A protein has these predicted regions:
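Histidine-rich, glycine-flanked metal-binding segment
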Residues: 19-22, 27-33, 46-87, 102, ...
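Acidic, glycine-enriched loop/beta-strand segments at the rims
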Residues: 23-31, 42-53, 66, 348, ...
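His/Asp/Glu-enriched, well-ordered alpha-helical/loop segment
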Residues: 25, 108-119, 127, 294-399, ...
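Tryptophan-anchored aromatic micro-motifs
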Residues: 37-41, 425-446, 452-461, 467, ...
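Active-site core of metal-dependent hydrolases
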Residues: 51, 155, 228-323, 337-338, ...
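Beta-sheet ligand-binding and adhesion/scaffold domains
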Residues: 92, 437-444, 475-547
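Polyanionic/metal-chelating signatures
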Residues: 137-277, 409, 415, 496-502, ...
Length: 714
C-alpha cells in the first residue's frame, strides 16, 4: 500500500511541478490567459532576436523582445534556445473539399448548359463557394501542420472559373466559427473544365482562353444593367470582383498565357506555376504577377539499368538537375513568388526540398517570406498573418534550431494560440552516465536521446538489468528490475531534471523503503552523427533556348552580313544569278548585286559555290501549338492559335533544317468554322512574341468533309 501511495504522490508531484498545469492529457492547450515563451530566438521580418520572449493571449501576439515584462499569472514555456518562426500560409490547396468525379459521364456530346439561370457554359462556376462544401479533415490538417502551415486557403480545383475559396486555421479541437478566417477569400480560375459537368466546350487550352475572355466581356456588359434576363453566375462574378484572383496555370507555357490574360484585362492574377519557371524566365520578368511555385522536385533516376537509361530524355535529366535552382532564379529576376506544398507526397519532403533550394542559392529571408508574408499579403491578410508582430494572430512554429539547418525539426505548431506538438521534446539534454546508490549497491544509469524518444540502460557492475522509463515534462520515471536480488524485486524512481547533467528526486528501494537521491553525470555521451545521406547542391547545368534537346546556349542575334560570290535564286524576273553578293541587316535584305563594297560593321561570308534561296513558306501547318482543335462548338471562330504557340516544339528545329522559315499554323478540321490561325517566323530559341509577324493579315480555318462529320472518329 505504501508503494502505491508513494508512487501516486510522485506522479502528482511531477504534474504540479511543471511550467504549466492546465491540461496534461493531450497535445493542445486550452489556456486563454497570458502565455510566455522565454529563452527563444525569435525570427522577425527585421531579423532574429536572440534570448528573447514572446507573449500571447487569446490567440494573438501581445508582445515580444528582450527584457520585456511578463505579466503575473502567465504560463511560461522555457524554450531553452529554440527558435520561433511565423507559421506558414498555404495559398493553394483543396483542404476539406471532396474531389469531384464525373459519375454521369456520357460519350455523346453535350453542347448546351445543364444549369438553368446561370452562365451559358457549365464550366463557369463563379457562383460556387467552396466553404459551403467544406468539412474539416483532421488527418490532412496534421500533415499540413507538420510541414509548418497554420492557415490554408482552399478551393475546389474544379472548373474554368472555380468560384471562391476560403481561409481556415488548422486547429483540431475548435469549431468552424473559430477556425474560419475568411469564408470568401479569393476567386480561382484555370484552363481546365469541371469534372462535374459534361458540356463539350471548351476542349482545348485556346478554347478555355477564349471562354475566359468572353466571360469578362459578358460581365462588363451585364454590369451595365441592359440584360433582360438574370444570370446568377455573372452576378456572383460582379459581386466578387474585388477579391484577390488566383489562376491555376500549372504547365509552364500556360503560366505565360495566364499572365497575358492578366494584363489584357488589367487584373493581377496570382498564378500557380509548374516549378519550371526558370525555362521561360525571359517572358515572366516582363509581367508583374506573383507566382505560386511547387517544390516537388524530381527524385534522382535509377541509372543502374543500361537498357532503361536509353529511355531517359535530356528534358528529364535537366529537370532533375535544374529544378532546385528555380526559386533562386525567380528571386534573381525580381519575380515575387509563393512556395506551395501542392504536389508534395511525403510531409518530410517539404522542408527537405526547401532546404535543397537554399543550398542552390535561394536567399533564406526570401524563402521565409515566400511562406509567410507574401502569401498572407496575396490573400489580403497581411495585417494579421505571416509575421511575429503585435496584434497578429498567434500563429508560429517552434523549431529545434535554425529552420534551414539539416538537423532542425519542427517541434510545435501554435495556431491562434492553440498548441499542436509535432515532435515531443524535452528542452534539456541530459544525456550521460549517472550513478545511483540503492540499498548499498551502485547502479549505473546510462541515458541517451533524452530530447526525443529517450533510451535508458541500467547496469550493476557489468550486468545489464531490465528497466522501464517514461519522461514527462522534465520528470523522469524509472523502474529497475534486479532479478539477482529477487524475481519480484524492483525499485522505482521519480527524478526531476535540474540541468543538463543533474537529476534528483525520490524513490522506493528494493526493500520498499523511501529514499532521496541526487546524482550528476560523470560522462557526457557523444552523439553519433551516423551516415549523412543528404546530398549537397549539385552543379546546375546551363539553360539552353529552348531548354530541350538541340537548344541553343545563346539566342541568335541579328547581324549585318555580307555574303559574297553566291548563286542567288531570286524568285524574280532576274532568275538565278551566279557570283552575286547580298547584304542583310536588321533582319532584312539591304542590297543584291555584284562586287558590292562591304559597308563598315558588316561580317563577311565567302559564299563561293553556295546557293542562297528565299526561305520556304509552309502555308498549312499544325506544328508548334499546344492545341490545334477546338471542337466543342460547330463554330469556334473566337479561338486563336496565337494564344497557344509552343516555341519548344522540336519541329521548329527540324523544319529549319529543311529550309522552312515561315509557317501558317492552322486550326484543325474538327468543325466547319475553326479558329484563327497564326503566322510565325521559325526562330528557334526565341520568345513567343518575337515569332509573330507584325501586321500579318488575319486568317481563319474553314473545313468540310470527313473530319468535320467525324464519321471515322472513335
Amino acid at each position: 500500500m505504501k508503494r502505491f501511495f508513494l508512487l501516486s504522490f510522485f506522479l502528482s508531484f511531477g504534474l504540479y511541478s511543471q511550467d504549466y498545469f492546465i491540461v496534461n492529457d493531450g497535445v493542445k492547450t486550452k489556456e486563454y490567459g497570458n502565455t510566455a515563451f522565454t529563452n527563444a530566438n525569435i525570427y522577425t521580418d527585421k531579423g532574429v532576436i536572440s534570448n528573447s520572449t514572446l507573449i500571447i493571449n487569446d490567440g494573438k501576439i501581445i508582445n515580444y523582445g528582450r527584457n520585456i515584462d511578463i505579466p503575473k499569472n502567465t504560463v511560461i514555456y522555457d524554450l531553452g534556445g529554440r527558435y520561433i518562426y511565423p507559421s506558414f500560409v498555404e495559398t493553394f490547396s483543396n483542404f476539406g473539399i471532396e474531389k469531384y468525379s464525373r459519375s454521369d459521364f456520357s460519350r455523346s456530346s453535350q453542347y448546351e448548359p445543364s444549369r438553368k439561370g446561370y452562365y451559358w457554359n457549365d464550366h463557369i462556376l463563379s457562383d460556387y463557394n467552396a466553404f459551403d462544401n467544406y468539412i474539416y479533415n483532421k488527418s490532412d490538417a496534421d500533415k499540413m501542420r507538420k510541414m509548418g502551415f497554420g492557415v490554408v486557403n482552399s478551393n475546389s480545383n474544379d472548373g474554368v472559373h472555380r468560384g471562391t475559396s476560403f481561409t481556415v486555421a488548422l486547429i483540431d479541437d475548435k469549431n468552424e466559427s473559430y477556425r474560419l478566417i475568411q469564408d470568401k477569400s479569393s476567386e480561382y480560375y484555370s484552363f481546365s473544365k469541371s469534372s462535374r459537368y459534361n458540356q463539350s466546350y471548351p476542349n482545348s487550352t485556346m478554347g478555355a482562353i477564349a471562354l475566359i475572355r468572353q466571360l469578362f466581356h459578358d460581365a462588363n456588359w451585364y454590369s451595365q444593367g441592359v440584360s433582360n434576363t438574370k444570370d446568377l453566375a455573372l452576378e456572383a462574378l460582379i459581386e466578387n470582383k474585388d477579391l484577390p484572383k488566383f489562376f491555376d496555370a500549372g504547365e509552364k507555357l500556360n503560366v505565360i498565357r495566364a499572365a497575358k490574360l492578366s494584363n489584357e484585362f488589367n487584373l493581377n492574377f496570382v498564378i500557380k506555376g509548374s516549378g519550371k519557371e526558370y525555362e521561360n524566365i525571359r517572358e515572366l520578368k516582363k509581367f508583374d504577377n506573383t507566382i505560386i511555385v511547387p517544390i516537388n522536385f524530381p527524385k534522382a533516376y535509377d541509372v543502374s539499368n543500361p537498357l532503361l537509361n536509353k529511355k531517359l530524355t535530356i528534358n528529364q535529366l535537366r529537370y532533375w538537375n535544374q529544378a532546385p535552382a528555380n526559386l533562386k532564379i525567380l528571386d534573381e529576376n525580381n519575380i515575387e513568388f509563393i512556395v506551395t506544398s501542392s504536389g508534395i507526397n511525403r510531409t518530410d519532403d517539404f522542408l527537405e526540398n526547401l532546404r535543397t533550394a537554399v543550398k542552390h542559392g535561394l536567399n533564406i529571408k526570401k524563402a521565409i517570406e515566400s511562406l509567410t508574408i507574401v502569401p498572407a499579403r496575396s490573400l489580403n491578410l497581411g495585417d494579421k498573418l505571416g509575421k511575429i508582430e503585435k496584434n497578429f494572430l498567434a500563429n508560429f512554429i517552434i523549431t529545434s534550431g535554425p529552420l534551414f539547418d539539416d538537423e532542425t525539426e519542427i517541434d510545435e505548431n501554435w495556431v491562434k494560440g492553440n498548441r499542436h506538438i509535432i515532435n515531443p521534446v524535452n528542452t534539456v539534454n541530459f544525456d550521460g552516465e549517472y550513478e545511483i546508490n540503492i540499498n548499498g549497491n551502485n547502479y549505473n544509469l546510462i541515458i541517451s536521446n533524452s530530447q526525443d524518444n529517450i533510451n535508458t540502460r541500467v547496469k550493476k557492475d557489468s550486468i545489464n538489468l531490465k528497466s522501464k522509463t517514461s519522461l514527462q515534462d522534465d520528470w523522469l520515471y524509472l523502474t529497475i528490475f534486479d532479478e539477482y536480488k529477487s524475481k519480484a524485486s524492483y525499485a522505482q524512481l521519480s527524478a526531476k531534471i535540474i540541468s543538463e547533467n543533474t537529476i534528483s528526486g525520490l524513490g522506493i528501494d528494493f526493500n520498499n523503503d523511501e529514499f532521496k537521491f541526487k546524482t550528476t553525470s560523470n560522462r557526457k555521451l557523444k552523439k553519433s552523427k551516423g551516415e549523412d545521406l543528404r546530398l549537397e547542391a549539385q552543379k546546375v547545368s546551363k539553360l539552353t533556348y529552348p531548354n530541350v534537346g538541340f537548344g541553343l546556349t545563346e539566342v541568335p542575334k541579328s547581324k549585318s552580313i555580307h555574303f559574297k560570290n553566291a548563286t542567288l535564286w531570286t524568285n524574280e524576273d532576274l532568275g538565278i544569278v551566279e557570283n552575286y553578293d547580298i547584304l542583310i541587316s536588321k533582319g532584312k535584305i539591304v542590297e543584291i548585286g555584284k562586287d558590292i563594297n562591304t559597308p563598315p560593321g558588316y561580317e563577311v561570308v565567302d559564299a563561293t559555290g553556295k546557293h542562297i534561296t528565299s526561305g520556304i513558306i509552309d502555308e498549312h501547318s499544325h506544328m508548334a501549338a499546344s492545341s490545334i482543335n477546338e471542337g466543342g462548338h460547330n463554330s469556334s471562330a473566337e479561338v486563336s492559335i496565337m494564344d497557344v504557340i509552343n516555341p519548344d516544339d522540336v519541329n521548329i528545329y527540324r523544319n529549319l533544317a529543311g529550309g522552312v522559315t515561315t509557317v501558317q499554323i492552322l486550326h484543325g478540321s474538327a468543325n466547319p468554322i475553326g479558329g484563327q490561325s497564326a503566322i510565325i517566323k521559325l526562330k528557334w530559341g526565341s520568345e513567343i512574341e518575337d515569332m509573330f509577324f507584325e501586321g500579318a493579315a488575319p486568317f481563319i480555318k474553314f473545313a468540310l468533309g470527313e473530319n468535320v462529320k467525324q464519321s471515322n472518329w472513335g
